[in-house]
Amino acid sequence: MNKKKLIWQLPFLAILVIGTIFIIRQQHVTPYQHDEGFIFGTIYHITYQSDENYQKEIEEELQKVDQSLSPFNKGSIISKINRNENIKVDEMFKEVFLLAEKISKETNGAFDITVAPMVNTWGFGFKQGKAPSKETIDSLRAIVGFEKVSLVNDYIKKQNPNTMLDCSAIAKGYGSDVVARLLKKKGIENFMVEIGGEVVTCGNSEKRVPWRIGVNKPTDDSLNTNTELQTVLNVTDKAMATSGNYRNFYYKNGKKYAHTIDPKTGYPVQHNILSSTVIANNCATADAFATSFMVLGMDGTKKILEQHPELLAYLIYSDDQGKNRVWYSPSMKKILAE
């Protein structure tokens, strides 16, 4: 009886073995493509397993994002909105605006794409400025606030024509999402998309293991040359974004001014968080919350994380003695590579 059962099972076992060998062989035969280029004022790196190279299509998609959301592109939709031109927004703009609005509400305004006039005035945006007066800041607070703009029938409506939008704190993450969607549409199962440090991963790396993504040590590095890592995370089928005040800053009269502006006060944030890394289901969300956590500080961040168990955070902060310390979501421990 057992012999008959074994004979009956043999064909199925053979199919299983052959299928497994075929899959493994295919994984080793199909090469990984390595694309890099320049977009949104930064460098991108994209690695994906495919016989075909899709860099041309990838760049076409990224140019669509730039044409919709870049305030540095004078012909973009967001630039026209900032000039108060009556223009219908596209699907990309709509998707980002609605997500930004949602996260603004969830963070009580810590994330706010209307902060553009303040960012510009401090010299970190798409217009020049540096260390404004208290009077200037007070006047800008009257035109900043996510509740001062709305999307009505595919048009942006402003309460004040001087209100301006800047999606820089979410656009790179969104760009990574757009590329990831394209690759999935092509049937690609193993890839890593990175645009200016904002990452989306799927499947495995060339080494047949989860993608390992580094978190930089937050050392003052305005030239973006520091490659020393604080830690490495195993990130698979997730998105990761990092925000920090150690690259975009300047000193005036011996005081450091960093690029993260608190929309409520109008001033650069002055607390002990040096770097905020967030893992989420999509990169636009990770990007926006990473910026929010830089504004909120440690206590505010922990409150948001209690409301959003789907988010993981890795925070590097300075203690009372000026030494770097780390706090991270308890469930993140399982993905710490080192």
Predicted region positions:
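Mature catalytic core of soluble alpha/beta enzymes
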Residues: 2-338
